[in-house]
């Protein structure tokens, strides 16, 4: 499959007249809770010819290259990515922590070195908790719950917990987050679900686990308060990102 994905990236470059500087696996396969029939979520960063960035009209800053049962391929323009780096958007940090890299270039590796300069515990944790709260309200009110949704919700919660407790970029693998940050009373239960997910196509629905859901809700609410109490880091300078962008376009 790696060869197929790399060939697809080459096709996209030719068709869109772009250059891809970074491409990774970014979904459940990178997080470690995929099943045999899970699709591949490929994300890439690309640049255009310098003249394209000098146009008066806005240029498209993303490419939805393919979406089917097997491949979900999407790319973001480098300028868009750099603006997200400035805001410490966790998704970009995850792309550079993925265990599966389909395309690596000197420009991509240089950007990876810059990321820590714009890393913010408060902004990243707030982002994860916001997503967790949305997922909680959307999927965890019914009497029966899709069991795989526990993984997505817990992942957001545990990423925030890692940030607040360790102050560093969290690991990508869900199992590592569970083993290091989930309360002991729930580890065996979640790891057993994870093993079943990896061995089968889907887990299906089950009656809502009220105790687990209460634990998750209380944890999210507590961490929301902790994040709000954190000091703002202050504004960062754009200069490092600007200089990097100029150098890539030369």
Which residues make up each language-model segment?
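Metal-dependent nucleotidyltransferase catalytic core
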Residues: 1-20, 24-37, 43-95
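Glycine-centered secondary-structure boundary/capping sites
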Residues: 17, 166, 183, 249-250
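Glycogenin-like
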Residues: 82-121
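Alpha-helix boundary/capping detector
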Residues: 46, 68, 107-111, 179
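Conserved nucleotidyltransferase catalytic core and NTase-mimicking acidic/glycine-rich helix/loop elements
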Residues: 113-237
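General structural signal for secondary-structure boundaries
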Residues: 1, 49, 77, 120, ...
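Acidic, carboxylate-rich catalytic segments that either coordinate divalent cations
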Residues: 232-250
């Amino acid at each position: 499959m790696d060869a197929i994905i790399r060939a697809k990236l080459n096709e996209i470059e030719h068709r869109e007249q772009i250059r891809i500087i970074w491409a990774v696996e970014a979904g459940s396969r990178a997080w470690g809770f995929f099943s045999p029939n899970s699709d591949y979520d490929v994300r890439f960063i690309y640049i255009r010819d310098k003249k394209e960035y000098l146009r008066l009209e806005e240029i498209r800053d993303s490419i939805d290259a393919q979406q089917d049962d097997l491949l979900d391929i999407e790319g973001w323009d480098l300028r868009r990515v750099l603006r997200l780096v400035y805001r410490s958007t966790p998704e970009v940090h995850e792309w550079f922590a993925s265990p599966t890299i389909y395309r690596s270039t000197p420009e991509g590796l240089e950007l990876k070195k810059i990321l820590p300069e714009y890393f913010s515990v408060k902004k990243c944790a707030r982002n994860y908790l916001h997503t967790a709260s949305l997922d909680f309200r959307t999927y965890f009110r019914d009497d029966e719950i899709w069991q795989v949704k526990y993984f997505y919700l817990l992942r957001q919660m545990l990423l925030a917990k890692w940030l607040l407790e360790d102050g560093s970029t969290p690991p990508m693998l869900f199992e590592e987050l569970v083993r290091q940050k989930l309360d002991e009373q729930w580890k065996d239960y979640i790891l057993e679900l994870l093993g079943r997910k990896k061995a089968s196509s889907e887990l299906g629905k089950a009656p809502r686990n009220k105790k687990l859901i209460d634990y998750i809700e209380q944890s999210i609410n507590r961490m929301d308060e902790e994040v709000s109490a954190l000091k703002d880091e202050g504004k960062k300078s754009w200069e490092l990102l600007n200089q990097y962008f100029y150098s890539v376009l030369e």
